[in-house]
C-alpha cells in the first residue's frame, strides 16, 4: 500500500464509527492542522491562477514538485471556511512528500469513504471533489513544466 493510501486509510478509520455531528467536529479539528503558509507563498491568495474556481469558498492551492518528484501542497483558505480547510488539511497531510503517481492514482471518493458526502451536502461535496481534481491537474501541469525545463536545459547544453 502506498504512503498516501496508508495515511488516508488511517484518517478514514477515524471517521468510520462517528455520527454526523462527530464527523463534522473531527473535520473541524483537522482544520487546525493546515500548515501556515511559508513566507515565499504568502501572496498565494493574490494570484488567481491558484484559485480553485469550482469551489464556492475562496481556496488557493499551489502544488510544487521537489527534485525527486515528490508532491508538496500549499494552501490559503479563509478561516471562516473550516470544513473546507479541514478537508484540504487532510489532503495536504496525506499527500505531502508522496510521489506524483501515488497522488494521481488516488480515487476521488474520499468523501464517501469518510462518510462526509451526505453530511456536507451536494454543493460543498462538489467543491471538495473539485479540490481533489484540481490537485491532480496541477500535478500533471507541474510534471509537464519540469519536463519542458529539462528538455530546454539539455538543448542549451548540447
Per-region residue spans from a language model:
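Structured beta-strand/loop patches that form or line metal/cofactor-binding pockets in enzymes
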Residues: 42-63
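Short connector loops at helix/strand junctions that flank enzyme active sites
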Residues: 54-58, 68-72, 85-87
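Amphipathic alpha-helical interface surfaces
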Residues: 23, 57, 83-87, 99, ...
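Amphipathic alpha-helical segments within well-ordered protein domains
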Residues: 12, 89-92
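Extended low-complexity intrinsically disordered regions
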Residues: 3-49
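Structural motif
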Residues: 17-21, 78-83, 123
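Conserved interaction-surface patches within small, structured recognition/assembly domains
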Residues: 64-82, 92-96
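C-terminal binding/interaction regions
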Residues: 3, 101, 106, 111-158
